[in-house]
């Protein structure tokens, strides 16, 4: 076993900023985005459309898609400073905020970004366990009949997913994850397509389109308001990748300029995503109407063909193995970079231990990476076991993440990047855009908190 200090760079090619030569392309960027976006959020969209109805549901998805595109375009120009093509690179979202905005805003951004990505980890643990349990229930219903009491717990599957993530978390960084993102993207296309196809087939079988313009009927107006608010939060959760856009852009090679490649990748990925979202959400609602389950593939609106339900849920599990890493790796990188700066001479922080095992690739283990990442995974798994509420957790995370990280900080950084003066036309348009999104976030936040508290106390 050999010891290699991370301060001593192994032989290879490096950019002028000390990082390895970037090899990312338009297609790898699209793969990273799709891995981040088409996740557990797609499974709740049929329920969201059911709460909003046939007009407000699809319109809401289009609006969130357009907002995501605008935000990603603004943020892609802030990757370099001062010039968006030739300026110094930023490796993390928080680095960009630190350059463009005040120190206080940097701390707020860093806290919200880490909280958001940590929350996505919790949501992915919940979703994976539900999908694993759904496979077991699907087989039970097939053997015992649809009325059989096929009841199983989530805890074992959460612990199993946590164990898998402890191993996957030892992947050093984003640049070593391209294969995992490509695999995860294939899986996301697979289960989104299956959800769409099953919904479409059920609509054909029903010979009618269920649902209404006003959505699911509730006993009181207050209940309707809470459900609509939570549905908006769930849709906001389904478009979350602005929080890791800078990290994805930092993998791209240049030329062509990274901001141009990222804009093309964002537009392509959002178009693909929105198509699948509309298909899954609308056909799911058309198939089940007011009885639309909270999770389209695990709520057991579909029982047969059971093997296809099993395959779709297996695809969800494989996708979320990669999705968890897409949102966790930036947190790992920030913490480990901070430790390396604070204690540059610590062997625990900076030394890597090379282990050679016959017939296997060389393993490089860093003790800080091993300890911190393991504790991180254990904590997300523990909180998921404490709050295993799918729709409520997704809505809360979407509401918390949407305005500050997707709208406010990109808009404020763009003002500095483009030197936009207050009360000019562009300033008024973007500030109005930001204020409207703030109102939507507050509405979604209130509804999601109410739903989470109600579920916990019920």
PLM segments and residue spans:
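Hydrophobic alpha-helical transmembrane segments
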Residues: 48, 167-171, 383-388
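Membrane-interface "cap" regions at the ends of multi-pass membrane proteins
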Residues: 1-44, 68-73
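Short, hydrophobic transmembrane alpha-helix segments
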Residues: 45-53, 174-175, 391-392
